[in-house]
Structure formats: structure tokens, C-alpha cells
């Protein structure tokens, strides 16, 4: 379930795969995904305990103990509701894995990639596990648990491991939201907007359902669809639909679901649902659209890369607005400065990709909360951003975009900054021990003080113009209400708004006499209101169709206006309105103070039974982790390769056993790896038998060898201890030590004899070895690269490694240095200038053998046709988009991209006479590999280079490459053009 209504970010390899690749032997799997991956850092050590309740097997840790009874009560209450509604019982204890905070939840090993801050929780179908943090307010936590538990019931009703087709997303997520039993105001807003503005897709057409910029709309359409089923067919109709879905999904088709469940055709179901939904929201058709308000301050999406506005803060002068907006080019959020006069873009304060932080932090309330703030002098914009485990407060200059100040927080979910008029302090909200409070931060010292210190969820603090009074929201009995207190005495809390509805994002008027805020009292729609602090009069300024949120006064030459975020036709826009003519006055009945109100209570109250507690076993619950994946590819030499991996993990994903099989040509490679991911330092043991091939014509014999005649193999059999220590998300140390049996040989014995004879004639050692090596290695790996669906877009990647193999008892002796450095320069939207330098050097009595060539390494040359103990290759490629997607008889192909590339490199063996280049007269063998042709001036001798053009497109998820290359020695270019086809990812 998503907290913020946005897409998940693109991430690198999972750490489990990255760790499994850290072997002491060459790993054939690297040709499938040639990236190093980022790190999921375990900042905390969890001493896991297990508690068994009537329906759950709860995994928690000692710091969670005080919350156990409460959360189990929520879970058992949810089970009672969902089981009753669906008339279904789960036959096993459901694994419920709990974290105290979201930052701890993000460290789970059960999510396949990185857990973004926008993911509230998840349920997975392989082991039917629920995984969630508990730092939501009580009523929202109850709803969250109900949502995820419904997924477990869905997985049990419609088993995912035997399905021929996927369950539609609107069914899975819609039923989960339906079972919560309530509508979130923002969710109801999106479905009302879709109904009134004629944007309801046909649910039976999956491609239409997924065609929304706001992914939450799919959840909400599903929620509404199940309410429609209940209204038309009753709860029994919902159950009939689910059991029919089970039968059809398992059987391989879904076209007959509606006929079998409801006796209507799919199109008739779509029409009936659309009619019902439009009729439901028909009374709202005459409400205000954004065009009724006046001025639109949003960036022009047709003229800029910026789309919607999710948070904003006006400057003190009212002439500029800082806004968090979506950047289509980067695929990320940015903070921009907008002109309040003509909505022109003044500056992007967070332009481009940065390693200073991982992501901007939005309010937990998304658009219904505050996420950024101008300082009172108008010189800087403040916001929270994620770096490491927690967030830091950043102050960025509006003139230069440079960071003026960065203050790390040791609290969770720090958000909603507000800079005080004294210039030395700031207000913000944050979580400690799972409870949200308002804090006062000293900007100079970096220290903070808890101002509210109560059991309620407090958020969105704002300061009065004179700097003496704080206004904020507190969640009471399932609703957000507005409170104030004097900054000098925070204990004197005063409740300003009352009633069973939400009042959010309060802020003072410029004269401090009013508080502006958004309220969903009327029709569960956020509208703008003000409360006169002297008279208590409440005025309402909008009557929105969608919703108007997060008001802030906008002062300027034209007088005072009220800026706010409005939702219409699926987009969040920044609007403004005059406050001189309110829509109406609102009466309010003052009620009891919040401290006298009993907060949320679950339906089932569970008493913890101490005898049901125990410690979790280290390897408890080992289980096959999903279906084994299948990877395939084709080298530029026409060699097919493929592989698969079987993974066994414990219930927490901390203990992993990986069994891998890879095939290249007729060669087979196998390895089994154990990796422990429970703590920050990951360690394990790998046993392997890997065989790879290369082509080599050394010692001036290249004219005598053809490709197959030069075929050699390298077989490594042994075991390695492996370890990784993440320094942060982007950098890590990798360690390995092992014992490996090396067997290197030419496939053709006659060729091997010829090479040995030639080595003796030259008085140099033979370069292929048989024996045992005991390597000990360390590498520094870094990857800041940002990826898109086609591959790298921006950033850098490097791996710098050293390995030493001592000689004792007849083992092979070698010392090896290996460095792979890549840099990606983004050009425009998705064009990339990619560079790479990979160098290696192995010394000692029996140095290691490296090989490269073909595919993405040195295009135009045979695959793995360069080999040696030392050498390098360098690449420079301009990759650019041609077609985003294209529909063909074979299916959807794309994106289609072009490549202009050039590469240079070479390798040689110990003792071999080798000259990379020269300026002396010589012979070029580019067009005549036997006799050559005379050349003068600078040219390559033993070095090699190529350039050309390529075409890449994706089919069934696999990148297909078509390359046309010219070979060159930098003096002579080949007359013929070499064509290569290969399947695999670019570096």
C-alpha cells in the first residue's frame, strides 16, 4: 500500500544478488546484469521474538514489547472482520512481521528492492507474510492492517503459485481498500473526480485501468467497484465474484468471470458500474472547478518538464512560490521557484541528480500536509530529505541553489518544517517511539526540544507572524483537529476546531488574527476555511468538486490572496483565490477538550499470553522463495547463454541459500551460496564449479589461429568466504577468501602443444595454469547510477579491487589489481553519453587470466577474443532515444534506442612482446590480417579499436542489440562493416 500517491523509484540489484556475486571466482551470472547494485543498509540489529496469537505468528523485537498487545488486538479485529465478510478461514497462522518505525521497516529483506518512503506496508504471496511498521495513528494503523490482511485472504482464495493469469490490480487492491470499510478523503476525491469528469475506464479492459498518472486511482476504482457489487448483488455477490475469479484465473482465462458470477457480459458490467458511479456523484456536478477560482500558478506542463504541484510555500514578499513538482525529464520530484505573477519558472533548486540526499521527504499527509517552507527573510527554502537511515533538514539558497545548512535528525519521519521569525529556530514534526510530536529546533546548535510530548499524533506546525504562538493539527478519535499553544508555554494547548471530520494544514493570516485551514466537514471534500481567533467566526471560501488543500496567504501588490493545492481531472494544481468574498459562514459547536476524549479502540482486545512468546530460531521456516527465474541471452559471437537460481530463505529473509546454474555454449557452471543478511555486515560461504571460455592467440601466433582453434576454457572449482560491509546506500567494501582449483587449457591439444613450444622458444612462461590458488581479496564498490527502463541514465559506478594469492605448499602465486570505472552524462531527456575504463594487471609466478571483447565491452570484435594477464579497454557511447514504444505483430517493442560508439583496448600475457601503438612506420593488419599493408604515422600495433552505430530495443523484457562496426588501428579503417547481434544489457 502506498503512503504517497506516486510511483516506486527505479533501484539497483537486490543486496542478496549483489552479495551472491561477490565470489572469489569469475561469475558467469554477471553477463546477465552487468551492474554492481546499490546497498540496502541494515542500520539496526534486531533480536527477533515470536508471539503466537489465535490467528497470527507475530515477529517483533524487544523494543516493540510495549506495543505488542495493542497491535495484536488490531490484527485480530481485522481478522474477525475480513473472515466474516468473505466467509473464509485461513488454515495457518499468518506471519505478521512488525517494525516499530518506517526507517526500521525499510531495512527488511523481504521486499525485492528498496522500500521507498511511500510504501506503508506490504503483503507477499509466496509465504503469505504481512510486513509493516506501526508508526501510524491508531485508527489508520487498524485500517492498514485490515488492508494487508485482506491480501492474505486473497492469496489464499486465489493461489498465486498456480495461476495462469495475473489477478487484475483493481481486484487485489480494491478489495483490500473495501474491507477497510472507510474512504480516505483524498481517495474519495480521486474517484469522485474520475466520475464527474468522465474518466472512468472499463474495468474489464486492464490496459485502460492502468492508464492513470495517479496510481492510487486504480485502488480507488477497485474500492468503488466492490461497493457497486455489494449494492447490486450483496456481499454474497462479492464472494461469488471471488470464487469465480479463482476458478477462471487458475484455468487461464478471465473473460467469463462476469457472466458466471453475475450473468452479464464484461461490457455490461462496465456500463452498469459507470452508470452507478456517475449516479452516486451526480449531486456534485455543479461544484466548483479550478477555473472558477481565478489564477492558476502551476507550471505550464506544455512548455516545461514540470507537471503537477504537490507542496508549496510562498515567499514573504508574495512574488515567488517555492513548489515541489514532478519533473518528467528526471522522473523525480524537484523544488522549483515559480513567479506568482506569470507562473514562469525562475529556478530549479534541486536540478539534476545529487548524492547529497536520496530523496525529498513529503509530508505523511501528502498534498494535505506541508513539506517545504520559505525562511522569513526570503533567502532560503527549507525541506527535509532522506540521507541514510533518517532525514536531514536542508536550507537551500534561492539565489544559487546551494545548500546553506544541513542538520541531521536522529528522529524518525521528520517533516513539515517551519522557520521562525528570529532566524535561529525552526518547528517541525517527527516520530519518537512511534508517536508524532512537534519539536523546536535550534538551527545553530542542531539540538531540539519536544514541545507537545503527548500520546496523540501531532503534525504540520506553523508559527504566528510575531513568533509567539504555534498552530498545528492533532489526531483525536480518528480525526485531525486544530490546536494552538504559546511557544513560551507549550503545555497550554487550546483546541480550535471540533467535530467528526478532518481539519488540516492550519496557518496564520499575515496579521495573525485568523487561521486558514482545509476542512472536509462538508461532503468529505477538502475546502478552504478561516477561523477568526477573536470572534470564533468560521468562513468557507471554496465549494470544490475535487478538493482544495494546504492554504497559505499570498501577499503582494494586488492585496492578499489565498494560494492552495487543488485537484481536478487527475492532477494537482497550484491555485489562488480572493478572500474578500467567502462562500458562507460555518457554525461550530465547541466540544470537550481532547484530553477527555477516549481515543480509538479496536473491536477485539487481546491479552498477551507470556507462554506464547519465544525467541526466533536462526534458520526458522526455510522455504523456497518464489519461482526460480530464467535468464537468457546471446553473445555477439552467436553463443547462447542461460541460467536460473533457486533461493531458500527463512521467514525474515535474513538467512539465504542460493543455488545457481548457468550454461554458456556447452559449458556448465554451478554454485551454492549461503549468505547471512541479518546485520549490517553480510557474510557467507560459496561453493562453486564454474567454467568459462575465451579465445586467445598469443605469442605472435595470431595469424595461425582461427576463432575455434583458439578456444580455451577456465574452470574454477572451490569454495570462498564472502563478506560485504555497506558504507552507505551507494558504497560498500567486499571481502573474499577461498581455496580454488584452477584448470585452464586449450580445447584442442594440438594448439596447446604448439603454444607451449612457442613459449619455450621465446623463453617466457606458459600462461595457462593448473593448480590450486588461495585468494584473499578486497574491493571498494560504488554505484550512484540512476537507471531507467533502458539502462543507466546518470551517475557513476566503479569497482576497485585487489587480490593476493600467496604461494605455500605448491599453490599458485599471483597478485591482481582490477578496476572498472564508469561515468554517465545525461543529455536532454533520456540521451546518455556513457564512458567506461576497465583495467587489470596480474603479476606473480602464475598470474591470472582476464578476457573480454564483443557485446558491450569492445564492439565489433569476437566475443571474449582478447585475453591476457594485463590490459584494458575503454568505451565511449552516445545512446539516444528513437521510439518510446511501437506496436508490432509480435507485440509491444520498445523503447527503441540508437547508439554511436567507439572503443579501444588490448591485452597481453607475461613475457609477451607487446606494443600497444607506435608513431614509426609499420604495417596495418586491419584489412589484411596475414600480410598487412604499409602505414606511416601514429597507429595501433597490438592495440585494437572500433567504432560504429547500433540499434537496441526491448522484446519480452530482453534488450536486443544490432551493431554495425568498423575496425580501425586509428590510421586505417576496415573496408567491410561487421554486423553483430547480441542480447544483454549495456554497461
Predicted regions and their residues:
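Beta-strand C-termini and the immediately following turn/loop, strongest in propeller blades
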Residues: 322-329, 339-340, 370-375, 382-388, ...
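Amphipathic alpha-helical substructures
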Residues: 88-90, 167, 188-284
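Conserved blade-ending motifs and adjacent loop-strand segments that build the rim/top face
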Residues: 500-503, 537-552
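Short coil/turn segments that connect the beta-strands within blades of beta-propeller domains
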Residues: 317-319, 377-379, 422-424, 466-468, ...
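C-terminal outer-membrane beta-barrel translocator/porin domains of Gram-negative envelope proteins
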Residues: 612, 686-692, 698-700, 705-712, ...
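Juxtacatalytic substrate-recognition/specificity segment
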Residues: 31-168, 185-186, 208-211, 253
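Beta/coil-rich, acidic/histidine-enriched accessory regions frequently appended to metallopeptidases
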Residues: 32-42, 48-50, 213, 247-376, ...
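Outer-membrane beta-barrel initiation region
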Residues: 572-573, 578-676, 680, 684, ...
